[in-house]
Amino acid sequence: MNQNHTLDNERNDDDEHSNNHVDTNDMKNFISCIKSKSNINDDKEDQQRPVRYLSRTVINSMTRGQLLELVKSMYSDRSDIYHMNSIQLLTLINKTIGHNGNYVQVVTKDYINDLNVTQLRIFCKELQLDTTHDVDRMNKPMLEILLKSYFKNNYPTSTNDDNDNENRSDDDDDDDDYRNDREEVEDSDINKNVNISSYNNEDIEEVDERTKSLKIDRRLLKMHQDNAKLVDKIDMLKNTIEDLQNRLLTAETTRDDILRRYSILENRENIRDDDDNRNSTTISNLQNLLNNANIAMTRSRINVADLTASLNERTKQLEDCLTRGREKDASIDKLNLKVTELEKLLQIQRDTHQDATLKISNIRMNDNNATRIQISSLNDELHRCQDQIKSTSITVYNRIYSDLYERLWS
């Protein structure tokens, strides 16, 4: 059953690899399976083979290779089973084999040797053997012995030496066959009601010769049968080896393809990592630029606020200056009006002076004393008027400029 174990490993076989020497056990199980398959058409051995019990949970946990070997032990003449998957094989088993409660009866040989450690532990726990034994710490041979002992004690078989027959070597099998042949010959003579004691010596010798010849013929027939079985086994082994080689080649091809795909994926992952690193670097740089821009914007906002406050203050100051300027302009306009009035007064005085000058010139023309006296008086009056105009203008100008000075510097 385990010839496909290494290739059809569809379920949990890790415990078996960790607790057993896989190559040795697999080879033993493979040989036992070949033996069981070679004897499947032997009616006599089928009658002597005991009824075994398998848990349905254990059967459901079997790999496709184990299920295929179980079905082949029941239907050696069917070729369609090699194309069935695990579900189809399980369906065929459940339809054909008998059952006893939760344990399926199967007519096969060394089925316990074909279970892995996990399946054996599940089987022991379902039989509640874990209450008396630490099955989790037992290896595969100990679990096999425990299960065989349990079924031998709780499910008696048709013969008492079944376990001995299972573990018997090929030489012991030949001795058993020879002993069975001898018993069959003796039984055949007894069943024919032959009275050997009534024969004479010649008859006895003839019977002995016939018995010896029959034994030799049976041994030769047995040898031919064994040779035929060996040839079948060799052919089966060749086919199995060829199938294993094909599967190994397929597995190597699949492995190379997987390695190639893994290399491609790894290269893609490396490229993706490089892109991610570049993207992360770019994102980091952009984040730094954004942070710097945020800092600059914050500073600009502070500066704008300061400038706005300063501008508002300067605007207020300018408005105050404009107000004061308007007031000063109004004062200057008033002063200009006063200056204009003074200029008018001066013009009037100049006109008066010219009139007086004309009068004086007219008086000079008369050239008389009265005129001269009048002229002198007029000159005196003129000088007095000039002095008065000068003092008045100086006073007015001083007052105007002092007022302007006070207003401009106030």
Curated annotation (Swiss-Prot):
The entry's keywords: Virion
Bias (Acidic residues): 161-188
Record's keyword annotation contains rRNA-binding: no
Localization per Swiss-Prot or TrEMBL: Virion
Region described as Disordered: spans on this chain: 1-24, 156-197
Principal location listed in the UniProt entry: virion
A GO CC annotation given for this chain: virion component
Protein's UniProt keywords contain Lipid biosynthesis: no
Name of the protein this chain belongs to: Structural protein ORF142
Taxonomic source organism: Trichoplusia ni ascovirus 2c (TnAV-2c)
